[in-house]
C-alpha cells in the first residue's frame, strides 16, 4: 500500500512539474519576446531628447510605459528639412533606409521584413521593422517610420522593449497622427 502511495505521489509531482513547465515556456511574456497585444489606449508622454545634437538637431522624444502600451516604447521624432526625394517622397524601402535614424537604433540591425505604406495626416510614407542586437544589450527591436511633405521628411524611430515591433506599430502611427505631433510638425516644417 505504501509503495502505491509513493508511486502515485511521484506521478502527481511529475505531472505538476510538466504542467508548470508548459505554462512557463508556452505563455508569451511581454518584454521577453512574447507577443504583445495592441493596447486600447496607449499613452505617450513627452520626455527629454536623450541624444547629442547632430546635423539634424534635436527632435521630440516620447515614452509609452509598458502598463499603457503592453511593452515599453521610446519614440524619437525629428524633421529632416530638404532631405527627402522631392519627386517620389518616401515611396520605397531604399528611401526609408536613407532617411532613417539608424544611429538611434543600436549597433546591429536586421530587417524583419519588407516595409509598408503608411499615412500620417496628409503625408504618405513607409514603416519598417528591425531587430536590434549587440553585446550587453537587452532584446529590443525598432520601427523606422518616415513620411514627407514635399522635400521635407519627418522621421520617427520607435525602440520597443521586445522582439516584435509590428504589434505596436498601429499605436505608434496613431500617436504620430495626434494633435501633439501634428502641431509640432506644422511648426517645424513652417506650414
What are these regions (language model features)?
Residues 7-28:
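Hydrophobic membrane-insertion alpha-helices, especially the h-region
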Residues 59-60, 70, 87, 136-144, ...:
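Short, surface-exposed coil-to-beta transition loops
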Residues 106-149:
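Signature of long, low-cysteine stretches enriched in small and polar/charged residues
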Residues 150-191:
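Surface-exposed amphipathic alpha-helical segments
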Amino acid at each position: 500500500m505504501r509503495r502505491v502511495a509513493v508511486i502515485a505521489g511521484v506521478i502527481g509531482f511529475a505531472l505538476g512539474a510538466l504542467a508548470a513547465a508548459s505554462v512557463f515556456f508556452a505563455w508569451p511574456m511581454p518584454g521577453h519576446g512574447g507577443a504583445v497585444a495592441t493596447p486600447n489606449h496607449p499613452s505617450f508622454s513627452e520626455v527629454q531628447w536623450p541624444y547629442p545634437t547632430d546635423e539634424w538637431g534635436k527632435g521630440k522624444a516620447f515614452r509609452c510605459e509598458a502598463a499603457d502600451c503592453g511593452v515599453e516604447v521610446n519614440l524619437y521624432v525629428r524633421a529632416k528639412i530638404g532631405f527627402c526625394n522631392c519627386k517620389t517622397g518616401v515611396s520605397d524601402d531604399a528611401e526609408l533606409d536613407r532617411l532613417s535614424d539608424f544611429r538611434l537604433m543600436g549597433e546591429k540591425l536586421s530587417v524583419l521584413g519588407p516595409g509598408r505604406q503608411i499615412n500620417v495626416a496628409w503625408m504618405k510614407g513607409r514603416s519598417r521593422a528591425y531587430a536590434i542586437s549587440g553585446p550587453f544589450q537587452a532584446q529590443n527591436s525598432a520601427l523606422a517610420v518616415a513620411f514627407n511633405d514635399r522635400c521635407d521628411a519627418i522621421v520617427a524611430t520607435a525602440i520597443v522593449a521586445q522582439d516584435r515591433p509590428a504589434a505596436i506599430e498601429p499605436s505608434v502611427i496613431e500617436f504620430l497622427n495626434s494633435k501633439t505631433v501634428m502641431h509640432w510638425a506644422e511648426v517645424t516644417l513652417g506650414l
